[in-house]
Design a protein with these regions (language model features):
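Carbohydrate-associated surface elements
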Residues: 40, 171-174, 194-197
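N-terminal subdomain of nucleotide-sugar transferases
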Residues: 1-57, 262-265
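A short, well-ordered alpha-helix in the C-terminal region of glycosyltransferases
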Residues: 232, 389-402
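A short helix/loop element that forms part of the nucleotide-sugar donor recognition site in Leloir-type
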Residues: 48-49, 204-236
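Membrane-proximal helix-turn-helix segments that form the acceptor-binding/catalytic region
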Residues: 112, 116-120, 148-168
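Nucleotide-sugar-dependent
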Residues: 14, 253, 304-313, 318-339, ...
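Nucleotide-activated donor-binding/catalytic signature segment of Leloir-type glycosyltransferases, i.e.
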Residues: 222, 268, 274-277, 282-309
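Conserved donor-binding/catalytic core segment of Leloir-type glycosyltransferases
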Residues: 237-253, 259-262, 274, 392
């Protein structure tokens, strides 16, 4: 099949690691012809161009800065990107007959691109990978009001995108329930779980023979040595459990609550906290960190993915934070790194997100609401007293059973 994937993510090839690169690599490896449309933000200083890389065709479209920028440029860039993408697709892919039209949110402003592709390819299936429920998430955290013209405009865009989609793949059961409840015009049977997913390296699979046992032991020894090296490299303690948060540091993550949790636990001598990332709220966190230097906390700017993954593997517990005001369920993809590293998790989220409940039900994590610092501290105590290795293994097994690209690939392909 000919497949086109339209995304805001900066993809430079499918041999990278990430939820979209892994999924597109799976489609390629299954024999499909993969075409990806991805932005080149203005800050990178390059023009729109088409390239062939890793056995796929990659169309990089010059846009304004959309991610990790100010609200004005982000908003303008989001409005303009639809036309920029459509013109580029017409120029470079206009002669191709597509069978599957894949696209992800954010943004919700690809409706005309999807409609154009469906007109040109009337037999194609359009499939939305829903990673962001906008504009309701922006209303929830006060970016604009429920009755504002912005919410009215973007809600119309959201509805139009859903109507242009033959199927909507959501990140979790709570996502599915939310979309069905708030969009009754859309056929409920066409909303399904197509979760964030990754490719898992084969060596980490459960051993079945002597040679595999030997390989697994070698892998564990390698990871133990790697952990010592990484902790030395980043000046982290070797004798304490380390709790790590890695990812975006913006308004959706509820950074004020994260800071309150770090403040409440900063004098502990039985554990250590590492925060890695960047975003609009990073300076706020950095200011707090500078005033509390040399305690049991380390704050670091975003690392290259390979370096971050190595750091995560050297830690003991993964942390998830989301703003308590959210009425929409979220499912941050950083969970996958934690589970692949066989780490248990603590999720501090709004009550509508089901990530924490799924973790508790399956024995690989704990959950509290992200407006209760004492409850978070109690979970730190509980985690320190738990069998973290067993919890981490349960998380890894859950990842293998539910969050591999094979799961997402099969979910999409069952419609053909």
């Amino acid at each position: 099949m000919n497949i086109i994937f339209i995304t805001l993510s900066n993809i430079n090839g499918v041999e990278e690691r990430g939820i979209y690169a892994d999924l597109m690599r799976k489609f390629r490896d299954e024999g499909h012809q993969v075409h990806i449309v991805s932005p080149f933000e203005r800050r990178l200083g390059q023009a729109t161009h088409l390239q062939e890389v890793d056995g796929i065709r990659l169309l990089k479209v010059r846009t304004l800065n959309i991610q990790k920028t100010n609200v004005v440029e982000k908003g303008l860039g989001t409005l303009l990107i639809e036309g920029q993408f459509q013109r580029a697709i017409q120029r470079y892919f206009g002669h191709i007959q597509f069978d599957l039209i894949l696209y992800s949110t954010p943004p919700i402003t690809f409706t005309n691109v999807v409609k154009y592709l469906k007109r040109k390819n009337p037999k194609a299936i359009s499939y939305l990978l829903l990673k962001d429920i906008f504009p309701q998430n922006a209303v929830d955290i006060g970016i604009f009001g429920e009755h504002s013209i912005f919410n009215w405009y973007f809600r119309k865009k959201e509805v139009a995108l859903y109507k242009a989609s033959d199927f909507i793949g959501c990140m979790s059961p709570a996502n599915v329930e939310f979309i069905r409840k708030h969009n009754p015009y859309y056929p409920a049977e066409r909303v399904e779980v197509a979760p964030n997913s990754i490719e898992i390296k084969p060596l980490s699979d459960s051993p079945r023979g002597g040679e595999e046992n030997k390989n697994l032991q070698e892998e564990r020894t390698k990871r133990k040595v790697e952990s010592i090296y990484i902790r030395e490299r980043y000046q982290l303690p070797k004798d304490k459990p380390i709790f790590i948060y890695g990812g975006n540091l913006g308004k959706p993550q509820g950074i004020d609550f994260l800071i309150q949790c770090l403040e409440a636990n900063k004098n502990r001598d039985d554990c250590y906290f590492v925060v890695v990332g960047n975003g609009t709220e990073y300076k706020k966190l950095q200011t707090w960190y500078n005033a509390n230097f040399n305690l049991n906390v380390k704050v670091m700017q975003r690392l290259p993915k390979e370096d971050y993954d190595m750091l995560a593997r050297s830690c003991d517990v993964g942390l998830i934070f989301l703003d308590h005001r959210f009425t929409i369920p979220n499912y941050p993809s950083r969970l996958l790194v934690y589970l692949q590293s066989s780490m248990p998790v603590i999720c501090a989220t709004d009550p509508n997100t089901d990530m924490g409940r799924i973790a508790e039900e399956n024995g690989y994590g704990y959950w509290c609401e992200s407006n209760n610092v004492p409850a978070f501290t109690a979970l730190i105590d509980k985690m320190l007293a738990s069998d973290r290795k067993a919890m981490g293994q349960r998380g890894y097994e859950f990842l293998k059973a539910n969050y591999t690209v094979q799961n997402t690939y099969d979910t999409i392909m069952k419609h053909f």
